[in-house]
């Protein structure tokens, strides 16, 4: 009896994989995801990457996603980012700019484990740039990014769910990389 008890305690049990991805709908049931975040902006407009803050909001539109046999969902994601840039590419003297970015994307979420989810998103972002007035004596320089426009946006990301309603969120894409916290 003692030997049997020792064997039961000492012999490792077979680990069971997290079956979250194979359980459709086994993800947070939410009406909105709120994600405040820090932003690193793309460096293709200025000589260095930008930095700032922002927020995203996700509204689920398909609870069980496009693949009914796995745990996935689809949401519309939109938000606002304020990004500051230094060192304009078109001048050798110091200059800077601030950008307001308004992303709108379709986000496809995959809940791969109880504490981890990944996603891909694609859409557009509207932007408005404000270059410092001292850069061009109050005028918009030729080739200056101080304007309004629309460009494509795409990203992949992951969330570490450290509770049922809060997750650390990393998004890597164009035009920004963000690190924030998601609340459901």
Locate the predicted segments by residue.
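C-terminal segment of classical bacterial N-terminal signal peptides
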Residues: 6-15
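Short glycine/proline- and aromatic-enriched beta-strand/turn motifs that initiate or cap beta-hairpins
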Residues: 16-63, 85, 173-175, 180-184
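Short loop/turn motifs that connect adjacent beta-strands in outer-membrane beta-barrel proteins
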Residues: 18-31, 62-74, 111-118, 162-166
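Predominantly the C-terminal beta-signal and adjacent terminal strand-loop region
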Residues: 19-22, 27-30, 140-184
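Residues that define the transmembrane beta-barrel architecture of outer-membrane proteins
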Residues: 30-32, 47-53, 72, 96-102, ...
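Residues on the lipid-exposed face of transmembrane beta-strands in outer-membrane beta-barrel proteins
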Residues: 36-40, 53-59, 80-82, 102-108, ...
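Gram-negative outer-membrane beta-barrel proteins
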Residues: 42-46, 61-65, 84-90, 112, ...
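Flexible, solvent-exposed loop segments that connect beta-strands
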Residues: 82-97, 128-148
């Amino acid at each position: 009896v003692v030997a049997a008890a020792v064997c039961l305690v000492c012999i490792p049990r077979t680990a069971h994989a997290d079956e979250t991805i194979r359980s459709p709908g086994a993800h947070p049931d939410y009406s909105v995801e709120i994600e405040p975040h820090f932003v690193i902006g793309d460096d293709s407009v200025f000589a260095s990457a930008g930095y700032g803050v922002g927020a995203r909001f996700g509204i689920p539109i398909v609870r069980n996603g496009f693949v009914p046999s796995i745990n996935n969902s689809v949401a519309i994601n939109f938000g606002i980012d304020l990004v500051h840039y230094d060192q304009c590419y078109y001048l050798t003297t110091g200059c800077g700019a601030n950008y307001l970015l308004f992303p709108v994307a379709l986000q496809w979420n995959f809940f791969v484990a109880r504490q981890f989810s990944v996603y891909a998103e694609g859409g557009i972002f509207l932007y408005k740039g404000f270059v410092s007035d001292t850069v061009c004596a109050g005028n918009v320089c030729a080739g200056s990014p101080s304007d309004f426009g629309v460009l494509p946006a795409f990203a992949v990301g992951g969330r570490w769910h450290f509770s049922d309603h809060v997750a650390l969120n990393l998004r890597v894409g164009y035009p920004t990389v963000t690190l924030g916290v998601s609340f459901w």
